[in-house]
Amino acid sequence: MKKRVMIIGLDCATPQLVFDRWLDDLPNIKSLIEGGIWGKLRSTDPPITVPAWMSMMTSKDPGTLGFYGLRNRVDYSYDKMSTANSTFVKEPTVWDILSERGKKVILIGVPQTYPPKPVNGEMVTCFLTPSTDKQFTYPASFKDEVQRVTGGYILDAVGFRADEEEKDRVLKTIYDMTEKRFRLARHMVETRSDWDFFMMVEMGPDRIHHMFWKYTDPDHPKYIAGNKYESCIYDYYKFVDSRIGELLAKLDEETSVLIVSDHGARAMVGGVCFNEWLINEGYLVLKSRPAAPAPVEKCDVDWSQTKAWGSGGYYARLMINVKGREPQGVIERGAEYEGIRAELIEKLRALPDHNGNLMDTQVVRPEDVYKEVRGVPPDLFVYFGNLAWRSVGSIWPAQPESVYTFENDTGPDDANHDYHGIFIMRERPGEQSLQAEGLNLKDVAPTVLSLLGEAVPADMEGKVRTRDHLGKD
């Protein structure tokens, strides 16, 4: 019987819900855990969808990949940004390697696969696809079958940061999207017999966390007991588990199955207006304030007086205005650069929250966490409150009374990302449950290749985590 590997990716599925709170109510996931290897999966720095999935599937860290989030600096100018789609991925993925070796692959919804690249098999691209009017399959002719089977494929739940009156509509879209994706996956298993590697990624968990976390987490500062969405995330997890069960029922016993996520989730307390803080501290100087809230690249900044600026998001990126690197750089390379970095690290780590308590902010130098640093990296990553707070990048028309805010500048959002996702792997039937420690997202690609009996490229940064290899490293 042919050896195969299937990965079911659940973007943002988080261990405190899957492993700790709801496992007994997720029978299909529980059955894989009871006969497989499982544990928390350390995400990338930063722990975010792009670059995490591609780091997972290339076994290379973001520094090697050369992109550090969905949007990245094009160069060392102040305003040029680009979206990291598939054209940014220069390192070989698992499916690239398998395709070159004559193995058949099927991909559905894996982040950063748009625009589609040729594979030895079939592909449906990801949430970065602008619409299904674009070419979102490989081969192009596969598009008609996808639309017929799904009744109209849904790429993403657009508007997941919607206002209150839109929540029911978007919630229905999340369910419809998930249903169609799993329907397509079942169809592919039923109608294709020659695949070796199958991977799908469902974005629904991420969307539902960001939209409904405050309604379901009693520890969230905005939680209200008895609200109409209290069981919303729980109900969705049970729905996903049922669809996983239907898909597993289509597989033979020689198929190894992995369920993985790229990062976890946690309650978001609020936001730190990062650039406003930098203005207050004298690092960022404006010529004038904007007429409406705006990011730095759209503001009238006095770059000749500016030492550093930042970006917003679930984590912050801090850039230093370096002489000879940025167009109007003021900080000399070497000792002055390292001095201001050290100064900023010290100040950010000491930052109190809105109540005056130490926030426990983590600050990361790229060179400390990456094997090498390519592209145009930030000078520092900042995880406010150890990811309990987000970075708000907007600069306001008038100086705010406080750098702390409890309303998101890009729409309602009450969950942040967390450092650990989930890893569950059933290699073969009839084995005992084994909880593994120290699992890293980069371990997935070499593990898949090993399961298929394929040689693991020497430059992959992760470890093989099959049952035979655990404990040997």
Q: What are these model-predicted stretches?
A:
Residues 171-193, 198, 214-259, 263, ...:
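A long, amphipathic alpha-helix that forms part
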Residues 2, 15-194, 203-210, 463-468:
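Active-site-proximal alpha/beta segments of enzymes that process anionic O-linked groups
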Residues 3, 10, 17, 24, ...:
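Secreted, luminal/periplasmic, and some membrane-associated catalytic domains
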Residues 377, 397, 438-440, 444, ...:
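Long, internal low-complexity/basic segments
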Residues 98, 200, 318, 382, ...:
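A short aromatic-rich beta-strand->coil structural motif
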Residues 28, 343-350, 422, 443-451:
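Generic recognition of well-ordered alpha-helical segments
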Residues 7, 197-201, 258, 424:
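Structural motif
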Residues 386-445:
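Low-complexity, glycine/alanine/valine/leucine- and proline-rich hydrophobic stretches
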